Every structure is written in structure tokens, then in C-alpha cells.
């Protein structure tokens, strides 16, 4: 009955019965044969039933009952391994045995799956089964990796080999699942480890890391991992994190620094470690013997201790007789007050790392071989692919994979450095050694993408308080810095250049500096691993940054902080408080330029200022906490802490941060305490000097600053530390900014402007400012009038000849001295600096400020300049008086203050230090021009480059116009007309400059492709010139054959002459398929129903360079020219070009459009032509053909695939009348290579423009 009760408590009896019957039906050992394992009749179905039980009962109900029953029935060891061994021994077995083996794996994978303890989801069943299943998994691992009958791991891989041989794109979902199943099986075997809270009864060496590595090597599992890792991204994609998981559980907690050392060196290291451990044990025994009980301790001891106050305290125990320190410690322990204990926190150490792993020599060599091969072939592909999976947050990526990724990056980087060091020490420079000497093997974790991923994860882990992930990222960051440092000191010029580039990018972001300082400053109780990682990163980062900043004195850092400050609240009530508060609020962002300039100056890196970030008490406390483990720290860790304290106390002059009782006591105990540092340590002498110098400086400072006696008990803030160090408060210099500048919303007369400002001051109850201004102006007016009267009297008394002899300059130089505006109170002085309305009124009445805006201070002097006459001052006073008695009234109930607005400063992009000299570069490019419409970018290459172009407004000032046309019925005011005309001209000039800039940007890349093209001796240029002049000669010969003859020559028939003239001049009537357009080059395509626009806009834009052969026609037919222009405007404005019927050849006339460069602007205004559309067509890199031989260059953007070109150059589907008139003897121009479009001599006139 008790057994039944026990069964009911652990596993449901019905489930146990089903599982037991299935296991019995699977098979067993026969007695008739050789004693081997014999499968049951329905073994495959039994295995599938067992898989369904595991899957649908355990996993869905979350009970673990089936796994418990299978563990008790010893299914894996007694059945499944034997079945898989039968498949191996029988090589010629059928497909049936392969299915059997695969079904066995489908059961073993969930049985060996890692069991995680989750206090939130664990039930009573979990607490019952978990210890048993953990021990059962250890048994599975021992049986699998030590199975003598057959190699189980290689058998599992053999199942997946056919699936791996299939290309990645051809694999089915079953193939992918098979590969993942095998990899998960290998992961599970590598991951199973003895549970920390349970005692394993078997031999732990059979499940140790050394045994696992030996099994992986013997069964070629390492070769499988290398194959998959090296082909990651090509043949394998979603298996990346599984391979990462396997490698992680193979190398975790293995000391990579000892992996590549020689055997002799390794023995020496182990001897030193043993000696240090024995020495430490002797010191502990010596300390214990001081307090060890004697044979008289059974009698007991009780003593009285007399204190300074005369009170007596009772202390019991024989150890109270040793010394005063022990007695005080016992009295403290007997005190009734106990500080409250915190709740026990979760262990902060990295998850699943466990204790340090010690490998035997055989396993160490096997792992060394695997790591070397992995670094040579699989490191870059695997970690590059995993990083991309982490960045895109792939569905198969878990949170634990982030920690594993950064842990392995750090581990392999350290292993690579140790391998290089071992190869260097061995002096064995073979070909393999040369390959090892290259840092290309780990290049995928030293690129910018990796740094971005690392910085983002570092910031995210710190913000989310994921201390385990943050610890691994800090370890990774440290190893990357050490690797880059080794690259910089490798002696290879290429490696040094790469290292310099990497360091400049790492140190460029100031957010990284801030994050590291915050991490080490905010340490609390995250565990020793976190403490060790953050102090190591801080030490390495600061040390490398200091060395780099000394070599690069112009190091720049970028801060993403904005200097715009938040609006300040009004500090006090009342008129003065409102005035100042309004000034501050108005002045919030008015001085953006100065603030940006200040930020730019602060971005220049200063290592001394950067080092002060590690001086606060929080950072000191972190290193003090780390130093408290001095008995367990090695020499490198002790050196790390020593260097920090030494720099803080003696290089940064912040020794007062160490003047705290617990710190002084720690330093003293490290040297003279009961458990001091080992004197044989290499760091003992340095720590002794540091402790002595620190205590000596503390004593000396106590004599200088008696207040330090109190401050010894507390931590120091920055201001307190500064006072204790220098004896005075830290001086803070404030730079107040003047009030924001205001402007009027509408353009009004000066009288109305003064009235508005007077009304504002009256509404704000600040009439005292008006009285003060009027008094100052009145005194200045009296003084100025007296001076003017005196000057008139002197001029009247002076003879006429002396007056004539005086020069105009001397007379003009006689101006009165300026009058200084003197504020009567401090409030007035503040208002002159902070009140924007008063400042605007002072400017309107003519006052001037001596200091510029950037240098203005509250003590800046305002003056009444000597150029203001007494009458002007009197008029200003009268305007103020008038506005006081009759304030202005506005519509819709608006106030006078509503007529003003803040003067907006032009927005500027964030300026960084590397952009400070941008203006000088633009001045160089723009030839020193400073144009408002240039937007600071300038022309992207010098004008007059490889392409011939017209001169623009940037090259020379526009010509003056002799006549100015005015609108009918317009104003006769010449000033208004001039302003309007100038505005239009400026708008047109700005549009031209904009188009030039766009063109320059589009062809900049082509222009600077090959600098040899600027050389006239370059073969490419010679070839283009030769083709160009050949085409010119051919065209000139054609023109001479027609235009050079005034009449039909003798011997030539009339019909032949008309046919020749019609063929040559056929392009003038607008036919698409004939004329010179068809001969010289192809026309831009017609897309859909849209027609190509007229080329007159191109002429107006290009400046109208005249044609040599068209000059005489222009002189004789000016009227026809005008008609030609007017006729061309209509189709251009309509945006289409209709086809026209062909006219008889003898009735055609050659018409040339002549547009002079001087009338460029007028043509652009008067003609209704879409200039921007033609500019866009120019930007698409095709040149429209014309009679002077310009060639069309079709591009993928400009060519139409549906267009067909007919013989003779005809294209399109327009009316093709008179095809027999085509001139078949005219030479066809060869197309120019599309290396760079050039505009040569001649002018461009399209056939449609000749109508």
C-alpha cells in the first residue's frame, strides 16, 4: 500500500503503466542469439508512441512524468544506444534501420534538453522530478560520450549528412528539421553539467570537459562544427545560433591565456599557482594560530575594559587578551544594535558559466587545434552571420544568445592574441605563422557594424539593468581594445593605420565616454564578475585613450547633446522680476550661434577634463570595493586598482577623495594589518609606497584644513573636495546673455514703430523707462544744440578765405562727441541688458552700443552718436510724448505687444569640430564669393572645367540695361520700379545659380572619375577631339554643297537640285523622320501621349551663343527672326509638338533663331517656356541634336525601348511624306563615347524651331 501511495505522489500510475508497457515492447536482450539487443516487432511504432507521450503529455501539461518514468526504466542507456549501435554495425541495412535511428534521436533530444529553474513557473512536480532528471541527464551524457560499442555522436551526424549535402535552396522543411535536430542533440550533450546543488555518485571525470572534448575530437564532431561554421550564410543560415551555443559550452570558463602556451611554460605556471596557494594557506594558518584556543581555554576568560570615559565594559573569551584591536572588535560584535539585513538577492554572476575548468594535457591540445582551425576558417563567417541575426532580431535568436555572442568574441580575441604571442615566442615563422600574424582572421568583429552593435547593446543592457549581459559586453569591449592596441604596436604599417582608424572611430563618440564613466560610477552590488569587468574596461579604456590622445593632439569627439537650455521660470514677483523673467524667457534660444560655437569649442578632446569623470566618489567607491578583495586578486588586478588610486591622488591632485577612514584603514591593513598582502608579490612594494604617501598627505592636509577631521567620516562631493584641496570655494563664472532681438510683424513707419514700443512699455507698467529715455535725450539735445550754436558762431567770425581754404574732409569731420547713456539704478542697467522692448526702443531712437552682440555684457555702454542732430533728438522726444498721450489702437482688440515678434535666427545644422573650416573650403571653391543664394555649398567644381559653358552671374556682374520697361498703368515712382526690377533680376539669378548647382552635383562624379582627362595629351581627349573635328568637316562639306552655291550650277537638273536642297534642309519643316536630326543623331523619345517640348527654352537658358553661319541671315531677315520666335513659342507653351505636313522643298527657307547673351534675362522672362523641364532633361544626360552637329546620347532614362529607328535615321510614326527626298549620300556622324558630355563650338537649334 505504501508503494502505491508513493507512486501516486510522484507519477500517475496509469501513465507509468503505459510507459512501462511501451518500453517492454521496444525490444530487449535475447538469450538464443549472441546476447545482443533484439528489436521488437513494432519497434518503430513504439518509438513514435514514446515520442508522442513525451511531446503531448510532458511538454503540454508541464509535468515531467514521462521523463521521470523513462529515466527510471533506463531507456536511453539500455535501449536507444543499443539500437543506434545496431545501425552502425550493419552497414548494408535497409532504410528501415535509418528510420529507427532517427526515431531514437527524436526521443533522446527532449530527454537531454536543458532543464531551467524558473521560480515563477515551477510546480510541485518540478520540485519532485528536477533533481532526479538532472542526475539522469548526467547519466545520459556519460553513456553517450563513453559508449564503447559505437560512436553515438558521429552516428547522429551521419543521419543528417544526406540533408547537409543538399543545397540550401533545395532543402525541404524536413531536411532543415533533421539538421537542427542533430545540432540540438550535440548542444544538449555539450551543455549537460553536474548540478551545483547535487552530488553525483559516479565518476565526474567521465562527464568532465576534457572527456567531452576528447569525444568530440575522436568522433569528428569538431570537423562537423568547422564545416558548418565556415559555410555559414551560404549553405546554412538559421543554424548559426545553435553552432554558437555548442561552441560556447565547449570553451566557457576555459582559460584562453593558457591554451597556446608550451607544455614547459604551462608546468611553470601551474607550479607558481601551487606555490602561491600554499603561501596563502600558510598565512591563513598563521593568522588563525594567533587566536587559536589554548589548553586553558576550558576555564573561560572574562575581563573588564576601562574606556576613556571611565566606564567599564565586560568582554568574555580568551582571545580578548591578544590585543586592543581584538577587544574592540568583540565589543562591537556584542552591541545590541544590528543594521537591517537586506533580502538575499539573486546571484549576479554570469549565467551558466560555473567554476573555472581545468583541462588535461590531451584535451588542451585537442581544443587548441580546434580553436586554431576555427579562427582560420570559421570565425569570420559565423560571427558575422550571428551579428546580423542579432541586429535584425531574428525569430530563432534568444536573449541568452546575446551574452554568448559577446562572451565568445572576447574569448576568441584573447585566444588569437595568445596564439600570436606563442608563435612569436617560438620563433617558428612558417607559412602558417605568417597567416596567423594577420588580423584579417578576426576582421568581422573589428568593423564599424560590430562597434555599433556593441555600443547599442552596452547602452541597452545598462538601461535595462541586465547585469549579466552588460558584464559580457564589457569583457568583449576590453578584448577589442587590447586587440586594437596590439595591432597598433605590431610594426606593420597597414595594421597600424587600421588600428588608428578604429581607435578614432571608437573614441569619436562622447556618448561612449559617458557610458563607461556611468557604469563604473553606479556599481552597487552586482557581483564580483561585474566589478572585475567594469574596472578592467575602465582601466583599459582610459589607458589606451590617454596614449592615443598624446599621439593625436587634434583628437575630436562628437557629443550629441544640444546646448539649447530650458526656459527659466521667473525668480521673483514684481516689475523687476517680471522684466527679468520675460527677458530670460524671450532669450531662451535667441543666441543659437554663440551656443553652437561654445559647443564646438568643447568638443575638442581634453584628456584632463575627461579624466575628471572618474574622480567622483562613486568611482572611488567602486575601486575601493574591488581592492577589498586584495587577498584573492592577481598581480594584474592589483596593478589595475593601484594605477587608478595613484593617478587620482598624484596626477589629478584629488587625493582628498581618498581621505576617508575606511579607505585609509584599508590601505593600512593591506600593508600592516593582520592579513596583509603577500610580500613576495610584485605589487607589494608599489602598494606600500602608495599607502605611505597617502597617509602622509592626509596627515599634512589635516594640519592645513582642520575641517578635514569632520570630513574624514563622509564621502566628498566635488565642491567639498575642491575646498579641502585648495582652501577656497570653486569659482563659477556665469556669462549672461542679452535679451532676444525683436522685430515688427509688419512694415510700418518709424513714428508708428515708436508708438508701438511706447504702448508696450505702458501696458507693462514700465513708464519709468520712458521717462529715463526722454531725460537722457533731452539732456543730449540741449548739449548738442549748444554745440551747434557755438559752431555757427565760430563759422560766422571766420573770414571767407579761411572757410574756402578748409577742405571738405575737415568740415565733415567736425561732429560733436557722443553722449554716454548712464543708467540711474541697477534695475535700469539690468533692463538695458534684459528688456527686449526697451532695447528695441533705444535702437529706434538712434542709440548705439559700443560692444558687439557676441561680446555684450550687462555693463555694456550705450551712446547717443554725434551724427544725431539736435533737431532729430527733439523730433524723437516729441514722438515719444505723442505716443504717451495718444497710445496706438489696433483692430480686433490686439495689443501693442502683438505687433512684435522675436527675430528668428537662421537655422543651422549641428556644427561639429571637423566642420569648423568648412567656410574656408567653400571660399576656396567659390573663389571667395559670398552669395546668399549659394546655401553654403558653392559650385561643386571650378567654373570653366572640361565642359564649355556660358558665363553666369557668379562669374561676372550682369551688364547694365540701357532701358527699363514699366508696366502700363503702374506707379511712376522710380524707386518702386527699381526695387521690383532688382527683385526679379535677383530671383532669376538665384534660379540660374540653383540650376548650375544641380547640374554640377549631377556630373561631379563623372568629372572626377579620371584626373587624366584634364590633360590635353591624354589619349581619350585626343580621340574625342579627332572625332569632333572630323564631324565638323563633314558637316561643313555638306553645307558648302548647298549654302555655298547661290544658284543651280550648270549641268545639274532642276529636279536633282531641288531634291538635294530638300534633303539637306528637310529638318526645317518639323518632320520627325528627316533632316539633320535624323542624320546627326537620334531624337529624345516620345513617351505615351506627351510630346517633346520645344528647344527654345534650351536656347534661352544657354545664353544664346550665336552661330557663325547664321549672322548674315539674321541681318537680312530680322523680321523673319521675330516671326520664328513667335511661332516657336506656341508649341513650347502648349507642351507638345504637332506633326506637320511636308511642304515642297523649293518653298522652304532657312531660319535661324538668334538670341544674344546680353538679353538672356529678358528672353527668360518674356517667353512662356518651361525652363525647369528642359533643365531636368539636361540633367538626364542627353544632348539634343541640331544643325551644328550636337550629338544625342541616349541613356536608360532617356531612351524608349518601344521606339524603332528606320533606315536613314527616320524614327517614330509621324507623317513621312517624300521619303525619296532623303539625302542618302550625307555622311552619318559617329556617336561619341559616353564618358562625359561636352558642349563644343556652335549653337543648338532644333528642327522644330525653324518653323
Swiss-Prot record:
Compositional bias ranges of the Basic residues kind: 1137-1151
Cellular component terms (Gene Ontology): replication fork protection complex
Compositionally biased intervals (Acidic residues): 576-591, 1069-1079, 1103-1122, 1157-1179
UniProt entry keywords in alphabetical sequence: Cell cycle, DNA damage, DNA repair, DNA replication inhibitor, Meiosis, Nucleus
A GO MF term: DNA binding
Composition bias type Polar residues, residue spans: 1182-1205
Region: Disordered, residue numbers: 328-354, 564-601, 901-1021, 1041-1251
Annotated localization: Nucleus
Main location as per UniProt: nucleus
PANTHER family in the record: PROTEIN TIMELESS HOMOLOG, TIMEOUT/TIMELESS-2
Function in brief: Forms a fork protection complex (FPC) with CSM3 and which is required for chromosome segregation during meiosis and DNA damage repair. FPC coordinates leading and lagging strand synthesis and moves with the replication fork. FPC stabilizes replication forks in a configuration that is recognized by replication checkpoint sensors.
Assigned protein family: Belongs to the timeless family.
Protein name: Topoisomerase 1-associated factor 1
Species for this entry: Chaetomium globosum (strain ATCC 6205 / CBS 148.51 / DSM 1962 / NBRC 6347 / NRRL 1970) (Soil fungus)
Gene label: TOF1
Amino acid at each position: 500500500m505504501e508503494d502505491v501511495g508513493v507512486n501516486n505522489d510522484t507519477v500517475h500510475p496509469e501513465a507509468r503503466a503505459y510507459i512501462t508497457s511501451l518500453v517492454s515492447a521496444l525490444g530487449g536482450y535475447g538469450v538464443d542469439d549472441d546476447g545482443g539487443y533484439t528489436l521488437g516487432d513494432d519497434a518503430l511504432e513504439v518509438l513514435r508512441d514514446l515520442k508522442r507521450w513525451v511531446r503531448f503529455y510532458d511538454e503540454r501539461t508541464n509535468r515531467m512524468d514521462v521523463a521521470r518514468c523513462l529515466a527510471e526504466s533506463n531507456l536511453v542507456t539500455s535501449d536507444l544506444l543499443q539500437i543506434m549501435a545496431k545501425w552502425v554495425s550493419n552497414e548494408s541495412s535497409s532504410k528501415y534501420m535509418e528510420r529507427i535511428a532517427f526515431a531514437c534521436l527524436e526521443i533522446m533530444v527532449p530527454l537531454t534538453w536543458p532543464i531551467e529553474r524558473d521560480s515563477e513557473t515551477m510546480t510541485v512536480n518540478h520540485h519532485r522530478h528536477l533533481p532526479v532528471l538532472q542526475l539522469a541527464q548526467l547519466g545520459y551524457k556519460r553513456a553517450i560520450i563513453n559508449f564503447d560499442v559505437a560512436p553515438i555522436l558521429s552516428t547522429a551526424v551521419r543521419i543528417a549528412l544526406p540533408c547537409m549535402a543538399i543545397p540550401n535552396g533545395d532543402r525541404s522543411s524536413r531536411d532543415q528539421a533533421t539538421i537542427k535536430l542533430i545540432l540540438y542533440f550535440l548542444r544538449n550533450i555539450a551543455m549537460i553539467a553536474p548540478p551545483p546543488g547535487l552530488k553525483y555518485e559516479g565518476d565526474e571525470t567521465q562527464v568532465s570537459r576534457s572527456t567531452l572534448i576528447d569525444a568530440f575530437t575522436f568522433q569528428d564532431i569538431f570537423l562537423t562544427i568547422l564545416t558548418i561554421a565556415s559555410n555559414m550564410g551560404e549553405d546554412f543560415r538559421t543554424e548559426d545560433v545553435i553552432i554558437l551555443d555548442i561552441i560556447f559550452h565547449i570553451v566557457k570558463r576555459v582559460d584562453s591565456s593558457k591554451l597556446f602556451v608550451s607544455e614547459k611554460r604551462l608546468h611553470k605556471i601551474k607550479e607558481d599557482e601551487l606555490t602561491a596557494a600554499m603561501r596563502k594557506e600558510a598565512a591563513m594558518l598563521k593568522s588563525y594560530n594567533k587566536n587559536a584556543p589554548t589548553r586553558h581555554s576550558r576555564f573561560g576568560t572574562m575581563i573588564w575594559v576601562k574606556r576613556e570615559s571611565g566606564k567599564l565594559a565586560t568582554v568574555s573569551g580568551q582571545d580578548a587578551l591578544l590585543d586592543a584591536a581584538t577587544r574592540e572588535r568583540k565589543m562591537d560584535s556584542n552591541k545590541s544594535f544590528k543594521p537591517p539585513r537586506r533580502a538575499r538577492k539573486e546571484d549576479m554572476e554570469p549565467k551558466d558559466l560555473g567554476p573555472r575548468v581545468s583541462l588535461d594535457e590531451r584535451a588542451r591540445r585537442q581544443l587548441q587545434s580546434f580553436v586554431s582551425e576555427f579562427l582560420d576558417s570559421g570565425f569570420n563567417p559565423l560571427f558575422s552571420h550571428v551579428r546580423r541575426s542579432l541586429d535584425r532580431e531574428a525569430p530563432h535568436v534568444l536573449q541568452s544568445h546575446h551574452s554568448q555572442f559577446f562572451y565568445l568574441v572576447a574569448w576568441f580575441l584573447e585566444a588569437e592574441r595568445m596564439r600570436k604571442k606563442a608563435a612569436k615566442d617560438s620563433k617558428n615563422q612558417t607559412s602558417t605563422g605568417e597567416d596567423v600574424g594577420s588580423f584579417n582572421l578576426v576582421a568581422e568583429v573589428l568593423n564599424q557594424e560590430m562597434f555599433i552593435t556593441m555600443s547599442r547593446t552596452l547602452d541597452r543592457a545598462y538601461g535595462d539593468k541586465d547585469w549579466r549581459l552588460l558584464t559580457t559586453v564589457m569583457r568583449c569591449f576590453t578584448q577589442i581594445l587590447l586587440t586594437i592596441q596590439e595591432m597598433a604596436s605590431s610594426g606593420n604599417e597597414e595594421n597600424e593605420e587600421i588600428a588608428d582608424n578604429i581607435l578614432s572611430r571608437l573614441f569619436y563618440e562622447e556618448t561612449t565616454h559617458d557610458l563607461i564613466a556611468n557604469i563604473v560610477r553606479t556599481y552597487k552590488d552586482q557581483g564580483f564578475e561585474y566589478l572585475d569587468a567594469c574596472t578592467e574596461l575602465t582601466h583599459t579604456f582610459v589607458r589606451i585613450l590617454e596614449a592615443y590622445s598624446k599621439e593625436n593632439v587634434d583628437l575630436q569627439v562628437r557629443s550629441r547633446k544640444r546646448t539649447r537650455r530650458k526656459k527659466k521660470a521667473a525668480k521673483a514677483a514684481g516689475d523687476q522680476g517680471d522684466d527679468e523673467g520675460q527677458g530670460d524667457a524671450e532669450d531662451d534660444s535667441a543666441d543659437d550661434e554663440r551656443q553652437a560655437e561654445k559647443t564646438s569649442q568643447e568638443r575638442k578632446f581634453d584628456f584632463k577634463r575627461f579624466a575628471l569623470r572618474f574622480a567622483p566618489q562613486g568611482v572611488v567607491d567602486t575601486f575601493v570595493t574591488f581592492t577589498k578583495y586584495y587577498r584573492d586578486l592577481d598581480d594584474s588586478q592589483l596593478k589595475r586598482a593601484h594605477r587608478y588610486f595613484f593617478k587620482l591622488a598624484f596626477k589629478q591632485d584629488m587625493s582628498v577623495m581618498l581621505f576617508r577612514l575606511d579607505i585609509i584603514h584599508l590601505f593600512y591593513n593591506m600593508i600592516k594589518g593582520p592579513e596583509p598582502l603577500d610580500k613576495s608579490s610584485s605589487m607589494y612594494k608599489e602598494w606600500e609606497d602608495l599607502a605611505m604617501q597617502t597617509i602622509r598627505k592626509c596627515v599634512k592636509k589635516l594640519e592645513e584644513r582642520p575641517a578635514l577631521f569632520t570630513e574624514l567620516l563622509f564621502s566628498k562631493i566635488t565642491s567639498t573636495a575642491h575646498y579641502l584641496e585648495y582652501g577656497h570655494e570653486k569659482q563659477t563664472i556665469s556669462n549672461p546673455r542679452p535679451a532676444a532681438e525683436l522685430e515688427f510683424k509688419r512694415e510700418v513707419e518709424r513714428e508708428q514703430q515708436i508708438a508701438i514700443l511706447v504702448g508696450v512699455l505702458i501696458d507693462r507698467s514700465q513708464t519709468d523707462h520712458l521717462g529715463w529715455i526722454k531725460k537722457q535725450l533731452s539732456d543730449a539735445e540741449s548739449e548738442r544744440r549748444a554745440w551747434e550754436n557755438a559752431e555757427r558762431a565760430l563759422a560766422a567770425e571766420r573770414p571767407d578765405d579761411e572757410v574756402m581754404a578748409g577742405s571738405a574732409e575737415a568740415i565733415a569731420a567736425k561732429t560733436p562727441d557722443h553722449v554716454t547713456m548712464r543708467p540711474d539704478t541697477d534695475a535700469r542697467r539690468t533692463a538695458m541688458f534684459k528688456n527686449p522692448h526697451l532695447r528695441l526702443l533705444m535702437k529706434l531712437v538712434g542709440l548705439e552700443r559700443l560692444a558687439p552682440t557676441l561680446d555684450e555684457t550687462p555693463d555694456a555702454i550705450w551712446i547717443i552718436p554725434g551724427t544725431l542732430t539736435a533737431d532729430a533728438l527733439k523730433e524723437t522726444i516729441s514722438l515719444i510724448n505723442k505716443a504717451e498721450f495718444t497710445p496706438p489702437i489696433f483692430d480686433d482688440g490686439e495689443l501693442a505687444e502683438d505687433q512684435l515678434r522675436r527675430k528668428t535666427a537662421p537655422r543651422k545644422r549641428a556644427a561639429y569640430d571637423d566642420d569648423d573650416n568648412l567656410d574656408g573650403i567653400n571660399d576656396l571653391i567659390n573663389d571667395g564669393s559670398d552669395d546668399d543664394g549659394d546655401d553654403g555649398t558653392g559650385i561643386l567644381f571650378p567654373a570653366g572645367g572640361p565642359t564649355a559653358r556660358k558665363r553666369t552671374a557668379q562669374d561676372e556682374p550682369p551688364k547694365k540695361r540701357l532701358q527699363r520697361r514699366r508696366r502700363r498703368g503702374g506707379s511712376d515712382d522710380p524707386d518702386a520700379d527699381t526695387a521690383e526690377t532688382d527683385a526679379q533680376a535677383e530671383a532669376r539669378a538665384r534660379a540660374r545659380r540653383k540650376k548650375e548647382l544641380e547640374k554640377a552635383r549631377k556630373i561631379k562624379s563623372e568629372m572626377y572619375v579620371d584626373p587624366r582627362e584634364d590633360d590635353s595629351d591624354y589619349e581619350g581627349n585626343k580621340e574625342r577631339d579627332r572625332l569632333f573635328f572630323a564631324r565638323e568637316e563633314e558637316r561643313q562639306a555638306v553645307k558648302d554643297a548647298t549654302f555655298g552655291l547661290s544658284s543651280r550650277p550648270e549641268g545639274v537638273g532642276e529636279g536633282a537640285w531641288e531634291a538635294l536642297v530638300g534633303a539637306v534642309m528637310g529638318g526645317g519643316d518639323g518632320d520627325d523622320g528627316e533632316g539633320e536630326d535624323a542624320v546627326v543623331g537620334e531624337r529624345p523619345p516620345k513617351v505615351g501621349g506627351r510630346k517633346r517640348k520645344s528647344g527654345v527654352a534650351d536656347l534661352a537658358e544657354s545664353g544664346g551663343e550665336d552661330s557663325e553661319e547664321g549672322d548674315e541671315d539674321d541681318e537680312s531677315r530680322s523680321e523673319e527672326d521675330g516671326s520664328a520666335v513667335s511661332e516657336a513659342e506656341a508649341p513650347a507653351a502648349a507642351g507638345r509638338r504637332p506633326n506637320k505636313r511636308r511642304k515642297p522643298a523649293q518653298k522652304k527657307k532657312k531660319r535661324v533663331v538668334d538670341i544674344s547673351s546680353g538679353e538672356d534675362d529678358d528672353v527668360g522672362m518674356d517667353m512662356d517656356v518651361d525652363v525647369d523641364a528642359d533643365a531636368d532633361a539636361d540633367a538626364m544626360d542627353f544632348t539634343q541634336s541640331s544643325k551644328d552637329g550636337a550629338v544625342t546620347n541616349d541613356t536608360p532614362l532617356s531612351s524608349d525601348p518601344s521606339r524603332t529607328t528606320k533606315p536613314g535615321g527616320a524614327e517614330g510614326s509621324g507623317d513621312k511624306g517624300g521619303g525619296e527626298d532623303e539625302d542618302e549620300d550625307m555622311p552619318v556622324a559617329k556617336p561619341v563615347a559616353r564618358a562625359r558630355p561636352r558642349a563644343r563650338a556652335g549653337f543648338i537649334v532644333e528642327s522644330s524651331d525653324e518653323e
